[in-house]
Amino acid sequence: MVDNKLFPTFPTPVILYNFGKDSHDLNVSLVNDILKERKSDDDGRVASNMGGWHSILKMEDRYDSFKTLRDKIEECSNDYCRQTGHEDGLIVEKLWANISGPADINMPHHHGASALTGVYYPLYEMVDGEMKVQYQENPKLLPGSWDGKRGGSVVFHDPVYGQKIRLRKTKDVSPFTIEHYHLYPVS
């Protein structure tokens, strides 16, 4: 099992799992497979992303690296259930990848029928054509790292965000053209 740290600050506890240096080969494989997938499907799909690239779902069916990651996530997900007093036996599926650059964002959203959702960040930088990865023994959740070198902000939203709202029908509206959201309660 990987190192983990429970943050019981929220009604739904957050646990940070650190795979550390042992995940180096997996990280290299994941990044290479993600870049290979992007090369084969440069447009990707549009979901909550505004800018950036979003792969197809079920990457674990296409790449061994994602199958390995899925197994690790499934182990951590069931550990999360045990630590927080829930029944384990979760099955992890439908993994995907996002590539985001400067000014790319993902709009707040929820993942429908998912029991848990999480994110795995294989952060790296290319130096002289070689992938370099820094591993921290005790990473901290630090919202507001705006320099782009350590990733973006961590923002927590209410898990039921958007479930009982609707957007008024307006001509020519898409996630890329709308300037204001007008939210109306659904009774």
Region annotations inferred by a language model:
Residues G85-L95:
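A short coil-to-beta-strand element that immediately follows conserved catalytic motifs
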Residues M1-T84, I105:
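Non-heme Fe(II)/2-oxoglutarate
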Residues K94-V186:
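Catalytic core of non-heme Fe(II) oxygenases with the double-stranded beta-helix
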Residues F19, D43, M50-G51, D88, ...:
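Feature targets compositionally biased, intrinsically disordered low-complexity regions
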